[in-house]
Amino acid sequence: MIEEGVTDWPTGLFYTMYGVKKPVIFPETLKTIHGYIANQGNGYINIIIKAIIPPVFVGISTKQSPLYYNSTTEVYVPDESLKLYKVAENWKLMVKHIHPVSEYQG
């Protein structure tokens, strides 16, 4: 779990996710993500984002999915924010991978 109070997630911390099995939980305070959520990796990763307002992606094209080449990552967001995430810039490019947190079974 990423500690509460973190507002900015730096580039490169999730670039290779080989074999990650535990969920990564971002706090409600997260505002920006630099780079991709996940980039390459043969293991799945579940990401839980508690932020009600979808964090803004910095440093990637608005035409590029934040998952890059990783199609095994699933992102769980607050149920009440699901629609916001599915239409937000960049997030909308990975809509099949965004789920309400109430569906998370981990």
Language-model regions, residue ranges each:
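Short loop/helix-cap segments at secondary-structure boundaries that form the rim of catalytic
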Residues: N39, K86-E89
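C-terminal capping region of solenoid repeat domains
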Residues: M94-G106
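Structural signature of tandem-repeat unit edges
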Residues: M1-D8, M17-T32, G41-F57, N70-S81, ...
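Alpha-helical elements of the RecA-like P-loop NTPase motor core of helicases
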Residues: G35, K83-K86
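A structural signal for alpha-helix termini and helix-coil/disorder junctions
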Residues: Y15-T16, W91
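Acidic, glycine/polar-enriched metal-coordinating patches/loops
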Residues: G59-Y69, S81, A88-K92, G106
